[in-house]
Every structure is written in C-alpha cells, then in structure tokens.
Amino acid sequence: MIIPAFDLINGRTVRLYQGDYSNQKNYNVNLFNSLEVYKSKGIEIVHLVDLDGAKNSANRQIELLKKIVSHTTVPVQVGGGIRTTKDISTLLDLGVKRVVIGSSIVSNKKQVKQWLNFYGPDAIVLALDVHVDSSNKKEISIDGWQKKTNFILEEIIEYFLSSGLKHVLCTDISRDGTLLGPNFKLYKEICSNFKNINFQASGGVASLQDIIFLKKTGVKSIIIGRSLLEKKFTIEEAVKCWQRES
C-alpha cells in the first residue's frame, strides 16, 4: 500500500534533508485537509514523524497528535524519539494505530522485545535506518543517522523474529529526502530473506516508475513524503500505480 508521510516540527509540515535539522524545508499544507483527502482516496494509514519529540522527548507534540487522531478518520503510525514504555502507552492510548521504534532497537534491545510481546507485533514498527557499504554490508545508524553502529540489518531482524516481529520500516539513509530513487537491490534482498515481514520502503521515491519497481521487490508498503508534498505525482496516481501492479 501507499503510506503518505508528514514530518512535523511545531505543528508545521517540513522535510529535513538527510536528517539535518538545520537543513529543513517548510511546506504550506493543511495537514487535516490532506489527511481527509488521503482517506477519501483509499489510503489506509499515514506515517507521522514528530521531529520535536525526536530531538527532545519532553517536547513531544502530544496535543497536535491528539487533535489529529480525534479529528481525522485515517489511521496513523507515529515515530520520533519513542524510547520508553510510557511513550508507547501514551500514543496508543491516544488512538495511534502503530508506534515506530528507532534507536532503542539497538540501545535497548531487550526492552523492545518486551514491547513486541506486550503490545503485540501489530502495534509496533521497527524503523531500521541502514547505510549500505561497497561490500553490501547493511549497517544500522541511530540517533537521527548521526551515529553508525556495529549492528547489521539482518542480525537485528533475526533477533526480533522470535517475538513475532511483523512490521519493519527500512530506509537507505543515503536516499532519504533526495528524490534520487530507492535502493531496489536492498529491498529485493531483504524481502527475499524475510518473507514473513511486512517491509515498508522509505527514501528516495521520485516517480511513479519507482513505485512500480518497488512493488516488484516484494515490499508491502511504500512511504512517500517529499514527492507528494512537491506534487511530483498525485496520491490518486500513486495508489492506482500500486494497485495496477498487484
């Protein structure tokens, strides 16, 4: 499915280039109108990133998220600095459909396993930001991509499989926000290796052709942010393109 994405700072829709807060672009969009339009076009879930919460969990945009959930009918998954059980419970209690866990996957692996077991695999999305090197080694980066780790993508997925892991959002960080096109090879490999995981592809989608090629890799969803905001194509075109390839 197509998952439209909004990155939010102080209630505004923005895009960061390569995760850099000092390199942000503002978009003059009415978030609430957009969500209703997306719902009417058949969108089943929207991806929201709370960039204030990602930077400092004390600044989480709870009131905005509460308003979004109560005023719109399209389900949302929310990411951005979710690091504690309280963070997860607060969001799920608001009515958020899924929470997206990032850096804790590496820094707090056992706790994340407990969350998967407690909240269930449908409520949790693991966000894996990877840097693929010249030898095809897929290294995980954390903390807004500032920090490389020694963890490898495949090892992390294997670790969480026993807890029923179902949803993985995978981003090739060299592509995100660039409109350079996705890393098709990466998605084809991981979909082939982990057939029971619902992969969400993210980063670099610039054209309808990218959607066609991504669908063929085996991903279950494509997250699209900048291309929709900058009207590279319409949501109707994206949805039709996905359905046509089904």
From Swiss-Prot:
One of its GO terms (biological process) is L-histidine biosynthetic process. Its EC number is 5.3.1.16. Keywords: Amino-acid biosynthesis, Cytoplasm, Histidine biosynthesis, Isomerase. It catalyses: 1-(5-phospho-beta-D-ribosyl)-5-[(5-phospho-beta-D-ribosylamino)methylideneamino]imidazole-4-carboxamide = 5-[(5-phospho-1-deoxy-D-ribulos-1-ylimino)methylamino]-1-(5-phospho-beta-D-ribosyl)imidazole-4-carboxamide. It comes from the Bacteria. GO terms for molecular function: 1-(5-phosphoribosyl)-5-[(5-phosphoribosylamino)methylideneamino]imidazole-4-carboxamide isomerase activity. The active site is at D7, D129. It is an enzyme of class 5 (isomerase). Gene3D superfamilies: Aldolase class I. SUPFAM superfamilies: Ribulose-phoshate binding barrel. InterPro entries: Aldolase_TIM (IPR013785), His_biosynth (IPR006062), HisA_bact_arch (IPR006063), Isoase_HisA-like (IPR044524), Isoase_HisA-like_bact (IPR023016), RibuloseP-bd_barrel (IPR011060). GO terms for cellular component: cytoplasm. It is found in: Cytoplasm. Belongs to the HisA/HisF family. This is 1-(5-phosphoribosyl)-5-[(5-phosphoribosylamino)methylideneamino] imidazole-4-carboxamide isomerase. It comes from Buchnera aphidicola subsp. Acyrthosiphon pisum (strain Tuc7). The gene is hisA.
